[in-house]
Amino acid sequence: MSGFLEELLGEKLVTGGGEEVDVHSLGARGISLLGLYFGCSLSAPCAQLSASLAAFYGRLRGDAAAGPGPGAGAGAAAEPEPRRRLEIVFVSSDQDQRQWQDFVRDMPWLALPYKEKHRKLKLWNKYRISNIPSLIFLDATTGKVVCRNGLLVIRDDPEGLEFPWGPKPFREVIAGPLLRNNGQSLESSSLEGSHVGVYFSAHWCPPCRSLTRVLVESYRKIKEAGQNFEIIFVSADRSEESFKQYFSEMPWLAVPYTDEARRSRLNRLYGIQGIPTLIMLDPQGEVITRQGRVEVLNDEDCREFPWHPKPVLELSDSNAAQLNEGPCLVLFVDSEDDGESEAAKQLIQPIAEKIIAKYKAKEEEAPLLFFVAGEDDMTDSLRDYTNLPEAAPLLTILDMSARAKYVMDVEEITPAIVEAFVNDFLAEKLKPEPI
């Protein structure tokens, strides 16, 4: 276990008081679950979370100061019960060391040292953290993500009775009645044999309403084509009245608004960090893609339903937001030449498939997304923002969160050059240029 943890966190962590702790000692303490808490001292929501998380952490660890809770009392010094085998590590985005020190001083858990800025950034990219505060739980032995939305764990299971909060099958989480907007109720068993889109959305969210209008047409086309397909609306509306108003526009099913526990479990299952989000599932309930929103917007005629992920994407307005999710390889081409974009996709697809398969075998997300960018206003804006030359073809890796770019300046781009470029990036052998 210590090997994985040291690779992830480095050799040393620090306590709130500034004392160093050897990472390999976590294994000796029987830690089975690791929480990574991403936050910042300047964020009011992070300050609020720290207070509630401290009480939660204390209860699970059996600390008397946390008040009565499972495991507290005389047996607290004994071999830890499974629910107590938890450690949390704070991963900060602070830019001021004094503010960081003031913030971590009262934390009862550990923190990544302030100086480990590069490692912090790698963790943010690895787990696709898009907002703060965020709390994810990992199996401390295998490194697999157990739960992507630990904030809901704290809210829904404050005593830690469901520890270690591992993912449950979709069929189990969705079990119960589902509604149509005419008041008809169906059992979730009616979904058997169907592809399912789990749609997290809300009426108060303008991008949600825009997507819903497109999704209604996509749903109609797919059903008319004879496909077994259903969508389940999981509302984030702020009132039942708003839910009913929004749901009246939808021809599909919904989790009842009053079933807050089931809505929360679905958010937890898929680690929802923002809306709108459309998760596409196969008939067995396994995730096909988390990027259903992008796929629907890019495939107006639904010819590629159920939208299995492509190893290489063509950069567009609808998927450009993915550039902010982590490092992305972008091959810029002259799209005025017919077939140039397709040839570029074929050029980088073998290495993209190899990288994706390697990390899928480890049940991890690939550390890179792969794009081909043609010539349009959006691509021009991207070149301007990243200060890239107008050359084409141009092979780059862009890391927006690190404000860094890597450019391969060669006359001819070959599969071997692409693979070497990617491997050198993953091995941290490339020198970044600032964006």
UniProtKB/Swiss-Prot annotation:
Protein name: Nucleoredoxin
Predominant localisation class: cytoplasm
Modification N-acetylserine, positions: S2
GO BP term (any one): negative regulation of protein ubiquitination
Domain named Thioredoxin: residues: 167-321
Domain of life: Eukaryota
InterPro entries per UniProt: NRX_PDI_b (IPR041861), Thioredoxin-like_fold (IPR012336), Thioredoxin-like_sf (IPR036249), Thioredoxin_domain (IPR013766), TryX_NRX_thioredoxin_dom (IPR045870)
Subcellular localization(s) per the UniProt record: Cytoplasm, Cytosol; Nucleus
GO cellular component: cytosol; nucleus
Subunit note: Associates with the phosphatase 2A holoenzyme. Interacts with PPP2CA; the interaction is direct. Interacts with DVL1 (via PDZ domain); the interaction is direct and regulated by oxidative stress.
Function recorded in the entry: Functions as a redox-dependent negative regulator of the Wnt signaling pathway, possibly by preventing ubiquitination of DVL3 by the BCR(KLHL12) complex. May also function as a transcriptional regulator act as a regulator of protein phosphatase 2A (PP2A).
Enzyme kind, highest EC tier: oxidoreductase
Protein family membership: Belongs to the nucleoredoxin family.
UniProt cross-references to PROSITE patterns, sorted A to Z: THIOREDOXIN_2
EC number from the UniProt entry: 1.8.1.8
GO molecular-function term, one example from the UniProt record: thioredoxin-disulfide reductase (NADPH) activity
Pfam family, one: Thioredoxin_6
Disorder this protein is connected to according to its UniProt record: Robinow syndrome, autosomal recessive 2: A recessive form of Robinow syndrome, a disease characterized by short-limb dwarfism, costovertebral segmentation defects and abnormalities of the head, face and external genitalia. The clinical signs are generally far more severe in recessive cases, particularly skeletal abnormalities. All patients with the recessive form suffer from vertebral segmentation abnormalities, resulting in scoliosis and chest deformities. Rib fusions are considered to be characteristic of the autosomal recessive form.
Catalytic activity: [protein]-dithiol + NAD(+) = [protein]-disulfide + NADH + H(+); [protein]-dithiol + NADP(+) = [protein]-disulfide + NADPH + H(+)
Keywords for the protein's UniProt record, in alphabetical order: Acetylation, Cytoplasm, Developmental protein, Differentiation, Disease variant, Dwarfism, NAD, Nucleus, Oxidoreductase, Wnt signaling pathway
